[in-house]
């Protein structure tokens, strides 16, 4: 175990012994990391309100930020989830076996269902659901960033 592991308001991160935490990752407050997870460089999990949980065998790649909402929304990452570099997961639910692309954003109350995919750069707006097989390109749950 490595990185900044810091308590906040009486809650301390709980990390499975088999998890990898990069030396400059930060886990703050009510954060739970499951077995065989990997939390890569410059990733921040800030459980300064409701908690954050990351299920076993999931990996949060470099620069990912996971945060909660002051109004009681947790952030949950299921089992066997891959979260690409620089993604932002804010007070949302990512179910088992999902994939979040690089630089994607998933906002408050959104749900990415088991086995679903969110494309790189996509934004899943608050309260939306990304369904398995639909992906974030179906227009119902995500908006694509403007280009040029």
Positions of PLM-derived features:
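Short hydrophobic motif
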Residues: 25, 37-39, 58
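Short proline/glycine- and basic residue-enriched helix-capping loop/turn segments at helix->loop/beta transitions
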Residues: 82
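Short Gly/aromatic-enriched secondary-structure transition segments
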Residues: 33-37, 54-55
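Mature N-terminal segment immediately following signal peptide/propeptide cleavage
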Residues: 20-22, 26
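Glycine-rich hexapeptide-repeat left-handed beta-helix
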Residues: 1-14, 20, 42, 48-77, ...
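Short, contiguous, helix-prone interaction/anchoring segments in small proteins
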Residues: 26-33, 44
């Amino acid at each position: 175990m490595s990185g900044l592991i810091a308590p906040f308001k009486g809650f301390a991160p709980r990390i499975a012994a088999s998890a990898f935490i990069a030396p400059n990752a930060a886990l703050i407050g009510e954060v739970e990391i499951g077995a065989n997870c990997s939390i890569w460089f410059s990733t921040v999990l800030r459980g300064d309100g409701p908690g954050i949980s990351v299920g076993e065998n999931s990996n949060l790649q470099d620069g990912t930020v996971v945060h909660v909402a002051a109004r009681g929304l947790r952030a949950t990452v299921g089992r066997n989830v891959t979260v690409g570099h620089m993604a932002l997961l804010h007070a949302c639910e990512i179910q088992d076996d999902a994939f979040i692309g690089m630089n994607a954003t998933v906002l408050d109350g959104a749900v990415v269902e088991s086995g679903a995919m969110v494309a790189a750069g996509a934004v899943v707006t608050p309260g939306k659901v990304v369904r398995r097989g639909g992906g974030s390109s179906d227009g119902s749950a995500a908006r694509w960033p403007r280009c040029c």
